Design a protein with these regions (language model features):
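C-terminal TM-helix exit segments that contain a strictly Trp-centered aromatic cap at the helix terminus
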Residues: 37-46, 127-136, 200
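Hydrophobic, membrane-inserted alpha-helices
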Residues: 13, 80, 97-103, 170, ...
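Membrane-interface loops
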Residues: 53-67, 96-180, 184-188
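Membrane-embedded catalytic cores of phosphoryl/pyrophosphoryl-handling enzymes
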Residues: 3-4, 140-248
Length: 248
């Protein structure tokens, strides 16, 4: 029995070594993924213990007009722009973007990428809903909500799913990009959109800042964990790489 257990761990260690040998940059991804999930755990502890509440209130009120707490800080066009930004993380648009992207990937014979995208988004959606039900944290009541809400606040579903969807699409596009600068640009755009969605949720008063921070962390960690898993399965020849032309 001991020998069997030893062989299992030995085989896993050898596979992990080969994985890191062929994909050295994945080591950094694993470390980053561990950091993201650990930081998320710290945020959860702070929220459950109430340690984040004072800072949450302070940041939320900083974004409101001091003379009229009913209105967000800044001109009317900024509020309208924030509503547009928050829509980028809405379930309707994300579903449309995911479906359209998956159909395109299937059309150009990038089947593995299509199912990779659908798997990350589907499991992310389930996880987001389960966490909202489990934590059941009330949304801010200090200011009026400038956007319609349906579920509890923690973590921010818009921030979580925007990070998952756009970061996953960014990595798929980056894989086909011929230049490193273009890869960095695509990933940067994905991160920028996710950050913008999260900021808009706090600005509109529908989430505490800690809700949004948690959404970013778990969303990035979830997308990154799936990417690492995919690379590992490719190395083990469990998944076959798509033969796709690079994007020029």
């Amino acid at each position: 029995m001991r020998e069997k257990i030893f062989n299992i761990f030995k085989s896993f260690g050898e596979n992990l070594f080969q994985f890191m040998k062929h994909q050295p940059f994945v080591i950094g991804a694993i470390i980053l993924c561990f950091f993201l999930f650990s930081f998320f755990g710290e945020v959860v502890d702070d929220v459950l213990e109430g340690d984040s509440h004072v800072l949450d209130e302070k940041i939320l009120l900083m974004l409101r007009d001091p003379d009229n707490i009913q209105s967000p800080l800044g001109p009317g066009w900024l509020e309208e722009m924030m509503r547009d930004f928050t829509a980028l993380g809405g379930i309707g648009l994300l579903t449309l973007v995911t479906a359209a992207s998956a159909i395109y990937l299937l059309t150009v014979k990038r089947t593995r990428h299509a199912f990779y995208l659908l798997s990350v988004v589907a499991t992310g959606t389930i996880l987001s809903n389960l966490m909202k039900i489990g934590f059941d944290r009330p949304r801010p009541d200090l200011v009026p909500h400038d956007s319609i809400t349906y579920m509890s606040g923690f973590p921010s579903g818009h921030s979580f799913m925007a990070t998952v969807v756009y970061l996953t699409l960014g990595t798929i596009l980056a894989e086909a990009a011929p230049r490193k600068s273009l890869k960095i640009y695509l990933i940067s755009i994905a991160i920028f959109i996710a950050l913008t969605v999260g900021v808009s949720r706090v600005y509109l008063g529908v989430h505490w800042p800690s809700d949004v921070l948690a959404g970013w962390l778990i969303g990035a960690g979830w997308a990154l964990a799936f990417w690492i898993l995919t690379k590992y399965l490719e190395l083990r020849h469990i998944l076959r790489k798509d033969q796709a032309k690079t994007v020029s």
